[in-house]
């Protein structure tokens, strides 16, 4: 039975409501969040979702910082926190044990909405998904996050929609887990996975072709190449090799079973060897598509820095997934907001403008006293409330 959510009980700033509205529209369809015992929930799912969005949007430094703000900040207490407030123990219990199914549901539905709202760039290259992994520093008590002796790390395996500029599918593992097994799980048929050299795997190349999935993956320059057919190379192009080949040694049982295309080009003295089964693109377009792989690197850097996604508020694998999905949802909401308000992609300039705009609207409405608008944070910067 779908959850039934009453209209939101507290008035918020117009800008915050505009940001939050796409998620709010999904709530009536969201699976019901139920208590696992006889005790009533201290936070319903909407409370949990809003608190986590608030955490990422306002760059709180820790979960304790967020709980303190939910208690002491006038706006957060009245507009973000549960009706009866929230204690630290109840907040962390909720994050570590509840809400993941609901967050995943909201995330999937937001991805569908974003795919309609955002224009597609690079349409001439087809649907491109950059795939990469990112390590998250963990603490020693997170025993599941195995990495190496005296060090704990978790790893996100993420697919990033290059055309839309948004994250797509993800998986979370310990830091030692390999990245190649997740390519097929992340990539949908008809899409093209764009990966660096760490994903070179000749068995993977064969299986992706058998599954009707495409790839543009850089390989090592010393890979054994068996020429099947040479393709024409345009004059004056940075491309110096374009052919149908088999990769690997039959003697060592590493050879691909299905021929693929191999394109090589030189940029600023560096040679790039790209394995692909995209035969509809020119060699120069293959080079262009591989260059776009850096968009996932840029996303990870921006996401970590400006939404504080890797400032852990949970230590269980479940809780970390809750935090990651909340960070992704926040990013998608910002993507929709920036497109609708400015016809632009997400940028820190627009995020800062949003924070200040929300603050100004609350001041004008007289929703809280000036004492609550200025909080000491890190380098005594202006603390913009939402």
Predicted features and spans:
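Short Lys/Arg-enriched helix C-cap and helix-to-coil transition segments
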Residues: 101-113
